[in-house]
Regions:
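Polytopic alpha-helical membrane proteins, predominantly small-molecule transporters/carriers
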Residues: 1-343
Length: 343
């Protein structure tokens, strides 16, 4: 029962993340770089900090979390910086492929590589932990099934690209460009997988038994997102200067509206990793699902992003065969979430 609760919590977080680009559409008269960094303040700084505070028991301070973990803190933030590159290209992948296809390819690559890279790199720096032992047959099977589901959705995307006229493509996704979007999405997925590597290096940054299991991942999440914010802020401020868009922040007419929707987008985005931490607290009896939890989250993100893609009519004009292939891919991804537990 606890495993089902854990998976349900992760699924709710995935649904929220897949919805985070909906409020962004309500932002008015701001350039991409302006709203991206502002929503990042909420998604990558404020909310993760508040989440990390939940891991601090009464009588202790926030900074005590990091005592004796200097190397782990540095590595966690470093992979956060690398993940930030993935976050930037992630947004571009959706620009050229749409929410459904862009998230599908990027998150699929992220799910597979993120799950495997964590134990591999952890084993290099801390061989005594024997992190590779976590990559069991069940875990690899879960990753493979997830990638199969992603590949099927990718086929649906390719079918969509070849069947629609240029006018129909632009109507669904304004800047649709499948080859360019595919390359960017694969890069985004590889770099985004660094998030889970960061979590692996920061998995011991908590107060042990004094921190409830469901909050133990939150300090590492905060460090990763701080690293990611640094990357994104540098790029966005560069774009503000290049495009002369610093005035966006002074536009009082849209300030309250845009801050509201940036905060909402940030909260929805952060929900996935808050939910991941809470969900893992219910999965402690299953080492396989603990290792696969990040992959499961990414798979469910893909499922819900495609649901949003259908709602937002990004698949409008596609044949029934294309939609059928898409649905098969979604079903395979749903199966990948619980299949390893049955093996």
């Amino acid at each position: 029962m606890e495993i089902l609760i854990g998976l349900l919590i992760i699924a709710i977080g995935a649904f929220c993340q897949s919805s985070c680009y909906v409020p962004i559409n309500k932002i008015k008269d701001w350039s991409w770089e302006s709203y991206w960094v502002v929503q990042g303040v909420f998604a990558w700084l404020i909310l993760p900090f508040l989440g990390a505070m939940l891991a601090v028991p009464s009588g202790h301070s926030f900074f005590e979390l990091f005592d004796g973990y200097g190397f782990n803190v540095a590595m966690t933030m470093l992979f956060g910086v690398l993940w930030g590159v993935g976050g930037l290209t992630f947004g571009l992948s959706m620009r050229y492929l749409g929410v459904a296809l862009g998230q599908s390819i990027a998150l699929g690559t992220c799910a597979g590589l993120g799950t495997i890279m964590g134990p591999v790199l952890l084993n290099i720096f801390f061989p005594e932990m024997d992190a590779l032992s976590s990559l069991t047959f069940s875990v690899i099977l879960g990753v493979v099934v997830t990638l199969i589901g992603i590949a099927i959705i990718g086929v649906a995307g390719s079918m969509k690209a070849s069947s629609l006229s240029e006018e129909e493509k632009k109507a669904a996704v304004k800047d649709f460009n499948f080859p360019k979007g595919l390359a960017i999405a694969l890069l985004a997925g590889f770099m985004s997988g660094c998030f889970n590597v960061g979590l692996a290096f920061g998995e011991d940054i908590h107060f042990g038994t004094f921190t409830p299991d469901m909050f133990k991942t939150l300090p590492a999440t905060f460090l990763v997102t701080v690293g990611g914010f640094i990357t994104n802020a540098i790029y966005c401020f560069y774009q503000n200067t290049k495009n002369h868009t610093w005035s966006d922040y002074k536009n009082e007419e849209v300030w309250s509206n845009n801050i509201l929707y940036c905060a909402l987008a940030g909260a929805l985005w952060y929900s996935q990793f808050f939910g991941l931490s809470l969900g893992k607290g219910f999965l402690t009896e299953s080492p396989t699902l603990m290792t696969l939890s990040f992959c499961i989250l990414m798979a469910l993100n893909v499922v819900f992003s495609n649901v949003w893609g259908i709602i937002l009519k990004e698949w409008k004009g596609c044949s029934k065969k294309t939609i059928g292939v898409l649905i098969v891919g979604i079903i395979v991804l749903i199966i990948s979430s619980f299949l390893p537990q049955l093996v």
